[in-house]
Design a protein with these regions (language model features):
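Secondary-structure end/capping motifs
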Residues: 242-327
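Conserved C-terminal helix/tail region of periplasmic/extracytoplasmic solute-binding proteins
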Residues: 314-350
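Periplasmic-binding protein-like
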Residues: 128-138, 214-244, 252, 290-296, ...
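Bacterial N-terminal signal peptides that target proteins for export
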Residues: 4-24
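Bacterial signal peptide processing site
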Residues: 36-38
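C-terminal motif of bacterial Sec signal peptides marking the signal peptidase cleavage site
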Residues: 31-34
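Short, glycine-/small- and polar/acidic-enriched structural segments
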Residues: 41-183, 187-203, 220, 228
Length: 350
């Protein structure tokens, strides 16, 4: 998922095409491997095993999944779930393609549409963040009052972001690729350069910068500036959707219950598993991240208010696709409905 971030849009899209062609080849190999007796350990009788890969190291932004595991929400629905944490070298679509995992976490809406564009048999089946938590962060004394003020300034970006929200920023605000600087997940370059701007999650990097730099940075949540993407999506292979839709539905229902509990109940069970998986995490960071998820409505705002946690709609996906395709990211004749499946999310009963 992570490339140099300094190439042209055409080269970026070419990289995506290459990766997804590898993904499709991997799916074919996975189908052959399914005939082999060398399978993963089976779940206990009456339980379905689900291996779920997250998109980053264990953190509060995955708290609902860990909470569902810790409080038995998956088990009570007949699932034996293993959470495999991600990281900078983890490619969730490739893990799905190889059969190494059953479900995966998609960071943003571009991922699902990229898969659809390459006819990869993987779909988004739920979105556990109605607002993408991505932010741009600036020093408070640089006269930056809006995203538009960042044009022409150096911006520290992760490789994956160059083919995601950066495309939207270039189109809407006229940003250019020569502004991009490599983001290595350290605040040090940002702190060393008062003119620098860096990406981050509203739940993480602003807190780290405040602690390490001793000042409160200016923070701009892209979702509040019109960026329409979902985040924290669950990706499912078409094969699993067809073979065991009940397991997919159970996973989504249990995860929604886990998120409700994590945000509005006692988060300690989920936090304990997060801290176990990621010893570099701290309780203070978890606490402030959870508070910000609630304050910004990342999980429970938008369609989740009426449809429940995890909700997705045709209208929201079509809106995102229209914006992306109008910017030349996707062909306008792409069938956006190949990117997602709404059968597992439905409005709450009145």
């Amino acid at each position: 998922m992570r490339s140099s971030g300094l190439t042209s849009d055409a080269n970026q899209r070419g990289t995506i095409v290459t990766v997804l062609r590898i993904l499709l080849a991997g799916l074919a190999l996975a189908a052959l491997a399914a005939c082999s007796p060398a399978k993963a350990p089976q779940a206990p009788a009456g339980q379905t095993e689900i291996r779920f890969a997250t998109d980053w190291r264990a953190q509060a932004e995955q708290g609902g999944f860990y909470q569902a595991l810790a409080t038995g929400e998956y088990a009570k629905r007949g699932l034996k779930v293993t959470i495999l944490q991600g990281g900078p070298a983890v490619n969730v679509p490739q893990l799905l393609a190889s059969g190494a995992v059953d479900l995966g976490m998609g960071s943003n809406s571009f991922i699902a549409l990229n898969l659809a564009a390459e006819k990869a048999p993987v779909k988004a089946v739920a979105a556990f963040m109605q607002k993408d938590p991505q932010v741009l962060i600036a020093h408070p004394d640089q006269g930056i009052k809006s995203l538009a003020d960042m044009k022409g300034r150096p911006i520290l970006l992760a490789d994956a972001s160059v083919t995601a929200f950066w495309v939207w920023l270039k189109s809407k605000y006229g940003f250019t690729d020569d502004q991009v600087r490599k983001y290595n997940y350290s605040a040090a370059p940002f702190l060393a350069d008062p003119k620098a701007i860096q990406q981050g999650y509203v739940t993480s990097e602003p807190y780290t910068i405040e602690k390490e730099g001793g000042f409160k940075p200016s923070v701009f949540l892209l979702a509040d500036e019109g960026y329409p993407g979902y985040a924290a999506m669950v990706l499912a292979p078409d094969s699993l959707i067809a073979k065991d839709p009940k397991a997919v539905k159970a996973f989504i229902e249990a995860s929604a219950a886990g998120w409700a509990s994590y945000l509005n109940g006692d988060p300690r069970p989920g936090d304990a598993l997060i801290l176990k998986d990621n010893p570099e995490m701290t309780q203070a960071l978890l606490d402030q991240a959870r508070a910000k998820m609630k304050a910004y409505g990342l999980v429970e705002a938008g369609d989740a208010k009426t449809g429940g946690i995890g909700m997705m709609t045709d209208a929201r996906w079509v809106d995102f696709f229209k914006i992306a395709s109008s910017q030349g990211v996707f062909a306008k004749d792409l069938d956006v409905r190949k990117a997602y499946d709404l059968q597992f999310v439905s409005p709450k009963a009145p």
